């Protein structure tokens, strides 16, 4: 050991290196574009896996049963179900909270602004359905008219994230609001046209969950953890109705308070006292960990009380959603097998082209057209910072139908050839919409950059 090296000096150096490593990791985790890259890599891995010699392993893995039991009660669901209907509820919770914040003080703060995503979403449903029906007017092929009406919100947001900070935040909010409305319309279409109806008793259970949330908010429960219980009740109620249970996340997100809870002691005063206690404790060369615990706890409480719940929970969940849940969702759902698709079968080509054209051209036409009409008539206004170029970007990205479109296709077609053709059309359309959206987004960002002399 050299004279300048001692255990005491080695520890601070190791601590500095660790802090730098965690700081670098934290920067990566908060780069929007990096989360988009991770999502696309997961999707590419799934697509390659599903079309490799190990394709059977891919499908068997995601359909592995996961069981949970207490005494005589037990439940068993596939891994695929737990991701799509369980973990994705957290994704929709974050989306719902982002929209809640914007309704309070942002891009959706008044009716003229909030009505635009609704009109755009309806245009993005009607026009693709009409285009598909024109190309497939009869027979079983006509049953797939709803396939191109859907938008895969997770992939659309993931591709938008690749554009990073170059795109105004209100464009993202517009896309989120539109995609959620699109999702709700898709659920209604499935319930009315592709199922035996809804079990309305589930709405009573869902209502109980909502009332539990309102009651807990009323008595001032600030911690997020207790709300898991009424959230689970709401989720189960929606599952029982036949609707997509992940919508429970949207409902909870929209119910999240936008104001910090009223505390007896002002959070800044509490934080100041806690920091003073910490300073006094760490003045000793060897502070007692037991004495540090209380001021650290008070500091965390001050942080909790200072931030509105909608911001606090969203910030806490964002890294887990962006780098955990969304890549898992992509890995579990992007594995579309192209093996055995017979495009020479009757109706296959028209189904594939109908889906492809309706998603790539119909979605943007419907969204841009409805938005232009509403703004031109004076019924709506573009959100602050959103130009017509931004509306075009949202229209293009909304053409990423992917998982929701595939789900509707499996309900619409009994013929395996038509189903295979629809899946191929969805895959080609989603890839095309993503590429066109990225190209248009980079073009828009470049136009904003000042010319270098």
Swiss-Prot record:
Catalysed transformations (reactions): Na(+)(in) + 2 H(+)(out) = Na(+)(out) + 2 H(+)(in)
GO biological process, one term: regulation of pH
InterPro entries with a match to the protein in the record: Na/H_antiporter_dom_sf (IPR023171), NhaA (IPR004670)
Record keywords: Antiport, Cell inner membrane, Cell membrane, Ion transport, Membrane, Sodium, Sodium transport, Transmembrane, Transmembrane helix, Transport
Subcellular location, record wording: Cell inner membrane
Family listed: Belongs to the NhaA Na(+)/H(+) (TC 2.A.33) antiporter family.
UniProt name for this protein: Na(+)/H(+) antiporter NhaA
Protein source organism: Janthinobacterium sp. (strain Marseille) (Minibacterium massiliensis)
Taxonomic path: Bacteria, Pseudomonadati, Pseudomonadota, Betaproteobacteria, Burkholderiales
């Amino acid at each position: 050991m050299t004279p300048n090296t001692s255990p005491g000096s080695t520890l601070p150096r190791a601590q500095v290196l660790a802090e730098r490593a965690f700081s670098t990791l934290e920067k990566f985790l908060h780069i929007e574009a990096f989360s988009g890259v991770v999502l696309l890599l997961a999707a590419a891995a799934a697509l390659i896996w599903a079309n490799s010699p190990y394709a059977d392993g891919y499908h068997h893995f995601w359909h592995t049963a996961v069981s949970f039991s207490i005494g005589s009660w037990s439940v068993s669901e596939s891994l695929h179900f737990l991701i799509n209907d369980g973990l994705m509820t957290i994704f929709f919770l974050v989306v719902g909270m982002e929209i809640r914040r914007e309704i309070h003080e942002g891009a959706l703060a008044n009716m003229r602004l909030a009505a635009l995503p609704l009109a755009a979403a309806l245009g993005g449903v009607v026009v693709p359905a009409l285009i598909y029906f024109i190309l497939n007017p009869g027979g079983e092929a006509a049953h797939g008219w709803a396939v191109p009406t859907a938008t895969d919100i997770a992939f659309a947001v993931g591709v938008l994230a690749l554009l990073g900070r170059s795109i105004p935040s209100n464009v993202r909010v517009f896309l989120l609001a539109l995609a959620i409305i699109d999702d709700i319309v898709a659920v209604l279409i499935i319930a009315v046209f592709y199922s035996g109806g809804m079990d309305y008793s589930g709405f009573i259970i869902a209502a109980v969950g909502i009332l539990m949330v309102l009651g807990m908010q009323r008595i001032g429960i600030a911690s997020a953890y207790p709300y898991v219980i009424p959230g689970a009740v709401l989720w189960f109620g929606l599952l029982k109705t036949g609707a997509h249970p992940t919508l429970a996340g949207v409902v909870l997100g929209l119910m999240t308070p936008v104001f910090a809870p009223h505390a007896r002691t002002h959070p800044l005063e509490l934080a100041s006292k806690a920091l003073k206690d910490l300073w006094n404790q760490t003045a000793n060369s060897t502070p007692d960990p037991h004495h540090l615990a209380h001021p650290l706890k008070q500091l965390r409480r001050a942080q909790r009380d200072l931030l509105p719940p909608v911001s606090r929970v969203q910030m806490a969940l964002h890294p887990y959603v962006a780098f955990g849940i969304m890549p898992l969702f992509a890995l579990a759902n992007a594995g579309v097998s192209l093996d055995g698709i017979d495009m020479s079968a009757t109706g296959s080509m028209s189904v594939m082209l109908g889906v492809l054209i309706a998603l790539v051209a119909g979605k943007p036409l419907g969204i841009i057209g409805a938005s232009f009409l509403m703004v031109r008539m004076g019924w709506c206004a573009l959100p602050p910072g959103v130009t017509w170029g931004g509306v075009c970007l949202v229209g293009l990205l909304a053409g990423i139908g992917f998982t929701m479109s595939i789900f509707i296709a499996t309900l619409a077609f009994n013929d395996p050839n038509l189903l295979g053709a629809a899946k191929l059309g969805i895959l080609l359309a989603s890839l095309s919409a993503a590429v066109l959206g990225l190209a248009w987004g980079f073009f828009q960002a470049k136009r904003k950059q000042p010319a270098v002399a």
